[in-house]
Design a protein with these regions (language model features):
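A detector for short, charged/polar N-terminal pre-domain segments
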Residues: 1-5
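N-terminal core-binding DNA-recognition domain of tyrosine recombinases/integrases
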Residues: 10-24, 30-103
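Basic nucleic-acid-binding interfaces
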Residues: 107
Length: 108
Protein backbone atom coordinates (compact mmCIF):
# COMPACT_ATOMS: atom_id res chain seq x y z
CA UNK A 1 0.00 0.00 0.00
CA UNK A 2 1.18 3.51 -0.80
CA UNK A 3 2.04 5.99 1.89
CA UNK A 4 -0.31 8.87 2.61
CA UNK A 5 2.27 11.28 1.23
CA UNK A 6 2.58 9.37 -2.07
CA UNK A 7 -1.20 9.24 -2.42
CA UNK A 8 -1.48 12.99 -1.88
CA UNK A 9 1.13 13.68 -4.56
CA UNK A 10 -0.69 11.42 -7.04
CA UNK A 11 -4.05 12.98 -6.18
CA UNK A 12 -2.74 16.52 -6.74
CA UNK A 13 -1.23 15.47 -10.09
CA UNK A 14 -4.57 13.96 -11.09
CA UNK A 15 -6.35 17.18 -10.07
CA UNK A 16 -3.96 19.23 -12.15
CA UNK A 17 -3.81 17.15 -15.33
CA UNK A 18 -7.05 15.18 -15.48
CA UNK A 19 -9.52 17.42 -13.71
CA UNK A 20 -7.85 20.58 -15.02
CA UNK A 21 -8.45 22.56 -11.83
CA UNK A 22 -7.44 26.20 -11.62
CA UNK A 23 -4.11 27.22 -10.13
CA UNK A 24 -5.81 28.79 -7.10
CA UNK A 25 -7.83 25.64 -6.38
CA UNK A 26 -4.71 23.49 -6.67
CA UNK A 27 -2.84 25.82 -4.34
CA UNK A 28 -5.62 25.55 -1.75
CA UNK A 29 -5.71 21.74 -2.08
CA UNK A 30 -1.92 21.56 -1.67
CA UNK A 31 -1.99 23.68 1.47
CA UNK A 32 -4.96 21.83 2.95
CA UNK A 33 -3.55 18.37 2.26
CA UNK A 34 -0.06 19.34 3.47
CA UNK A 35 -1.58 20.55 6.75
CA UNK A 36 -3.55 17.31 7.02
CA UNK A 37 -0.40 15.27 6.36
CA UNK A 38 1.48 17.20 9.06
CA UNK A 39 -1.35 16.66 11.55
CA UNK A 40 -1.52 12.92 10.89
CA UNK A 41 2.30 12.61 10.85
CA UNK A 42 1.98 10.62 7.62
CA UNK A 43 -0.40 8.04 9.07
CA UNK A 44 -3.64 7.03 7.41
CA UNK A 45 -6.56 8.59 9.27
CA UNK A 46 -9.41 6.74 10.93
CA UNK A 47 -12.60 8.31 12.29
CA UNK A 48 -11.01 9.11 15.65
CA UNK A 49 -8.14 10.93 14.00
CA UNK A 50 -10.55 12.82 11.74
CA UNK A 51 -12.53 13.94 14.79
CA UNK A 52 -9.32 15.18 16.44
CA UNK A 53 -8.37 16.95 13.20
CA UNK A 54 -11.75 18.66 13.03
CA UNK A 55 -11.39 19.85 16.63
CA UNK A 56 -7.90 21.13 15.81
CA UNK A 57 -9.21 23.03 12.78
CA UNK A 58 -12.07 24.55 14.77
CA UNK A 59 -9.57 26.00 17.24
CA UNK A 60 -7.18 27.37 14.61
CA UNK A 61 -9.35 28.54 11.71
CA UNK A 62 -12.59 30.31 10.85
CA UNK A 63 -15.67 28.17 10.08
CA UNK A 64 -15.36 28.99 6.37
CA UNK A 65 -11.73 27.82 6.29
CA UNK A 66 -12.58 24.68 8.25
CA UNK A 67 -15.28 23.78 5.72
CA UNK A 68 -12.91 24.27 2.79
CA UNK A 69 -10.11 22.26 4.39
CA UNK A 70 -12.47 19.41 5.23
CA UNK A 71 -13.88 19.48 1.70
CA UNK A 72 -10.34 19.10 0.33
CA UNK A 73 -9.55 16.14 2.58
CA UNK A 74 -12.96 14.56 1.99
CA UNK A 75 -12.52 14.79 -1.80
CA UNK A 76 -9.06 13.21 -1.46
CA UNK A 77 -10.40 10.26 0.56
CA UNK A 78 -13.35 9.86 -1.82
CA UNK A 79 -10.93 9.56 -4.74
CA UNK A 80 -8.85 6.98 -2.87
CA UNK A 81 -11.93 4.88 -2.19
CA UNK A 82 -13.20 5.27 -5.77
CA UNK A 83 -9.85 4.03 -7.13
CA UNK A 84 -9.75 1.07 -4.75
CA UNK A 85 -6.77 2.32 -2.76
CA UNK A 86 -8.85 2.37 0.43
CA UNK A 87 -11.48 -0.19 1.31
CA UNK A 88 -13.42 2.15 3.55
CA UNK A 89 -13.57 5.92 3.56
CA UNK A 90 -13.30 7.19 7.17
CA UNK A 91 -15.59 10.09 6.24
CA UNK A 92 -18.51 7.68 5.71
CA UNK A 93 -21.12 8.13 8.41
CA UNK A 94 -19.05 10.90 9.99
CA UNK A 95 -21.47 13.73 10.67
CA UNK A 96 -19.77 17.09 10.71
CA UNK A 97 -21.55 20.25 11.69
CA UNK A 98 -19.75 23.53 11.61
CA UNK A 99 -21.85 26.51 12.52
CA UNK A 100 -20.95 29.67 10.70
CA UNK A 101 -21.88 32.86 12.47
CA UNK A 102 -24.64 34.65 10.64
CA UNK A 103 -23.48 37.89 9.14
CA UNK A 104 -25.76 40.85 8.99
CA UNK A 105 -26.00 42.70 5.70
CA UNK A 106 -23.70 45.69 5.38
CA UNK A 107 -25.30 49.08 5.05
CA UNK A 108 -24.50 51.21 2.08
Amino acid sequence: MQTLSQSIVQYLEMCEYERNLSADTLKAYRIDLRQFLEFTKGEWADRDMLNRYIKHLNVCFSPRSVKRKLASVRAFYHELEYNGILEENPFHKLHIRIQSPKQLPRTI
